[in-house]
């Protein structure tokens, strides 16, 4: 009954022109002009739930930019004009970029970019969930406006060699200001088919800011290590209610946005055809909504635990012939078995109450043919 059919037709056509100036005003530059047309026709039908959805999206765009650059400096100015058929006005998204290389091993960059998300249905809106035994569908609020963003970033990309060890360090600070930000809330009234309704609407503004650090080191030809961590804060300008059944539960913090997350990758190649890799992903605690059902008697927002997922993979390449290689691999996914342990169960579960790594500890083997 819950199954349906989705037809999605997408096509893109565009053109681009690039002209290089030996000198334009004060420095050599590259001028880029372009135009693009996007069409996406989406039709989703679930007969068992009497759900019929059709959406045609047409976007005509024109973009331009000029980048002045030499070995030490680059300065970019540009913008993009978009006309979306679900909006009655043209959107202008500016961008600017400043790069400075005081030495060959230091790259400093300051960036600004504007952007938007149109008031349209997205892939995740087509999903029909289950909350407390009732179907949950996502709808767009009346008079939904586009979400606008202004993003700034400042980064330093550093390279250095310590003896025989080659290293790279990237430090980036970022800040994004969002207006008419999209948010979701569960309404207390069902739709005409009796479905529980989750509405996408314009909340107040929001801000996302943080720091990203990534490092890479090549100790030898057979051992490399890469790691990164992101520290961020994601907050609405004013607290909003996530569920109309509990209007007193208001939060400024954005749901499903951890303040800390990171990764590491270690690769060993002791012999030519053998590779061993150890990878890990860290996800900090985040706030998520838990609707009433088999797990809780009334809706409540909870802070999830932290997760550290570690994976291992071993691979060996067998040359079959001059142009063909057979790889045999195997390993363990999620060695630490970092996995959610409080899933809802039964007919009245909250099907969206899922977080953390997608799989518990798992073992795998594989074969790969390359030529």
Residue ranges of each PLM-predicted region?
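Transmembrane beta-barrel strands of outer-membrane/channel proteins
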Residues: 33-39, 77-81, 96, 110-114, ...
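Residues on the lipid-exposed face of transmembrane beta-strands in outer-membrane beta-barrel proteins
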Residues: 13-19, 62-68, 96-100, 154-158, ...
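C-terminal beta-signal and adjacent terminal beta-strands/loops
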Residues: 179, 282-291, 316-371
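Face-selective signature of the C-terminal outer-membrane beta-barrel domain
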Residues: 1-88, 167-175, 210-212, 218, ...
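Residues that define the transmembrane beta-barrel architecture of outer-membrane proteins
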Residues: 7-11, 54-60, 90-92, 148-152, ...
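Membrane-embedded beta-barrel scaffold of Gram-negative outer-membrane proteins
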Residues: 1, 109, 143-201, 207, ...
